Amino acid sequence: CQFQAHLYYPNFLNRYSQSLGDTGVVRVVMEENIKYPMYGPDYHKRTQYSADLIHQKAMEWIDKQDGKQPFYGFFTYTLPHAELAQPNDSILKGYKKHFFRDKTWGGSEGSRYNAVEHTHAEFAGMITRLDSYVGEVLRKLKEKGLDDNTIVIFSSDNGPHEEGGADPEFFGRDGKLRGLKRQCHEGGIRIPFIVRWPGRVSAGMVNDHQLAFYDVMPTFCELMGDKAFPKKYINKKIKNDCFDGISFVPTLLGDDGKQQKHDFLYWEFHE
């Protein structure tokens, strides 16, 4: 459920792996976590940290790739988010030495999240933890000799939020842009989109091309040489169905003159 998905020490995680023989979603109970309550100080005695577990599975999957077949990995890391929770290891302890105890985040939304003391240290630690995950992914690709022939994209889903009492201005997270998550101003929808493709995407290049995530599929289709993708993936049972995405391959390759652009970006938000 959405509530468990928003916790870093959840009661369960869902798995669906055809390679493991799954025919549907499998609920994996976090046996060590459920020994302790979801609220109160004992919550932090839970040991099965979802972000670490997701990253562990991602690394195991990369380790199985041998370069003989194309592969596609979509790693949906959840760091950082509204809940402030993580192992009290060297990452967090290092930040606790540099950030003061301040107002608590959490405990103010009907006790949806457990409150913590070192809120900014916790948030900084979660960002550093994510950074370490990305570094491990890149090192694993290099270790297996796959890094020069693999496109790596790092991005986010939305701008900064206020859930749980978070302060979007701290760390300069708002980038001085107007708007927050769920809003259509730049602050809500303008996010990092970093691409690493050695020998094809120029290092350090910055481009202001506007795109949305539905542009990723046609981009990958073009890179694979599948030029018929717009006709293949429309629903012929729906009148006037169309393919909204536009490939941004020209932008990646530095050929802005050939880049087709959106007249506008459109999506719907349901929650």
Mark where each language-model region is.
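N-terminal sensory regulatory modules of PAS/LOV and PAS-like folds
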Residues: 1-2, 152, 248, 266
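Active-site-proximal cap/lid insertion segments
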Residues: 2-217, 221-242
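Glycine-rich, aromatic-lined ligand/substrate-binding cores of catalytic
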Residues: 212-225, 238, 242-251, 255-258, ...
